[in-house]
Every structure is written in C-alpha cells, then in structure tokens.
UniProtKB/Swiss-Prot annotation:
The gene is Cimip6. Coiled coil: none annotated. Residues 195-233 have a biased composition (Polar residues). Keywords: Cell projection. The keyword Cell inner membrane does not apply. This is Ciliary microtubule inner protein 6. Residues 127-159 are annotated as: Mn.
Length: 233
C-alpha cells in the first residue's frame, strides 16, 4: 500500500511539471507565432530523489516552480557535510630580546649623538649658491636694478637665428646704478632757504624795470628771519 501511494505522488508531481513546461511552450509560441512549434521531449525515467523538491509559491518569479534541495539528516552525512572545527592551540616559543641580532634593532635608552661631518667654525650658507653669509655688513650695497626685458634684437635674416640670451623676451635683467647719475635730493630746510633766496633776487629786478611796488619790497634779512621762524615752529 505504501509503495502504491508513493507511485501516485510521483505521478502527480510529474504531471504538474509537464503542465508547467507545456504552458511555457504555449506562451513562447504566442510571442513568436511565425516559428514552428516544438513539443517538449519526454522525460527520461530516472531514480526518484526524495529531497529534490520545487517551491510553487514564489512571488518574485510570478509563482514559477523553483527547484531546491531539502537537506535531510546532515548528522548521518557528517563525512562530507561542512562543519566548523575547533581551533587548535599552537604553542609559541617565548620571545627573547637579549640576543645580539634583536638588541641591535631596539630603540636605545640614551639619546643618539650624530657624527659632525663639517666644522663648527664654518658659517652657514644662505641662498641657492653659498656666496654670502648672514653676518655681511652694509658696505656692499645693492647697486643693481632688476627688471624684465622686452628687447628682442632678433633678425630672422641673419644666419644665427637666435636672440641674445641676456635680452630675451620676458627674462630678468639687472642694470647697474651709477653713483654719478643718481640725483641728490636736498633736505627740507635747504629747500625752503633756496626758494626764499630765489624769490628775493627776482624782486629788485622787477623794481628796476619800472614796477611801482615799493611798499611790498622785502629785504633778504626779513626773509631769512621768517624762514628761521618757520623751521623753529
């Protein structure tokens, strides 16, 4: 009786699988009517596996049957079934830092003294080229003016078709300032005295030419007194 019931269950499952396959074929034929209809091949009778089943209630794939394997009795199949093994305690030797090789690479307790590769009496260099030191006095003043040159002096008709290196377009050029060409700027009291003296020398010339301004003529002594009062204030 039990064998007959199992056979009936197998038949119903096979009929359900065949119906699903026929429905899929019909849907494909409806989508492509021009193609020839291909009937599914009959299933080969194989040994029935009890733990191979189908899920018929799957909303993700619109209730299509999804095959799955029901793992029954993993305790009996422990030889091939995956299981976690307990970690084994591995004994490690004690770490000894008293050997010669390990003590060389340890951090020393006292501060290290680096060797001096230069004389301490030598002054430090400044700038890219060590030509000047920090203790230079103001005797050697900077008598050069740096500017950008826009002089080409380029002629394509000449055989050396290159401009002068020192006067290329956009290069930095230094021009020496000559001491004789520099204008001497007078101080403030000298400027006032020079202006007052020049005004006093021009006024008597105007009186000689016939200008009737005798009341407004001032002497140079009064001008000097006024300039001294201005400076004192």
């Amino acid at each position: 009786m039990e064998g007959e019931e199992k056979q009936q269950q197998h038949k119903t499952e096979d009929d359900g699988i065949a119906c699903v396959a026929e429905r899929k074929v019909e849907i494909k034929n409806e989508k492509s009517p021009g193609k020839s209809t291909q009937h599914p091949k009959p299933c080969v009778d194989r040994r029935r596996v009890n733990y191979a089943k189908f899920i018929h209630t799957n909303a993700r794939t619109y209730n299509e049957p999804v095959p799955y394997i029901d793992n029954k009795g993993p305790e009996k199949q422990r030889k091939w079934w995956f299981h976690n093994e307990a970690p084994k305690h591995v004994s490690q030797p004690s770490y000894d830092t008293k050997s010669v090789q390990r003590s060389d690479f340890q951090k020393p307790a006292c501060p290290l003294v680096l060797p001096v590769k230069h004389s301490r009496m030598q002054k430090p260099s400044c700038g890219i080229v060590p030509l000047t030191s920090l203790d230079v006095s103001g005797e050697h003043e900077n008598n050069f003016v740096e500017y950008i040159s826009f002089i080409h002096q380029y002629d394509a008709r000449r055989t050396p078709n290159e401009p002068i290196k020192g006067k290329k377009h956009g290069t930095f050029v230094q021009r020496e300032i000559k001491l004789g060409a520099m204008p001497i700027v007078p101080k403030a009291p000298e400027v006032l005295l020079n202006t007052l003296e020049s005004g006093s020398s021009e006024q008597p010339q105007k009186t000689d030419k016939g200008n009737s301004s005798g009341d407004k003529v001032t002497s140079p002594g009064l001008c000097q007194q006024n300039s001294q009062e201005l400076l004192e204030t």
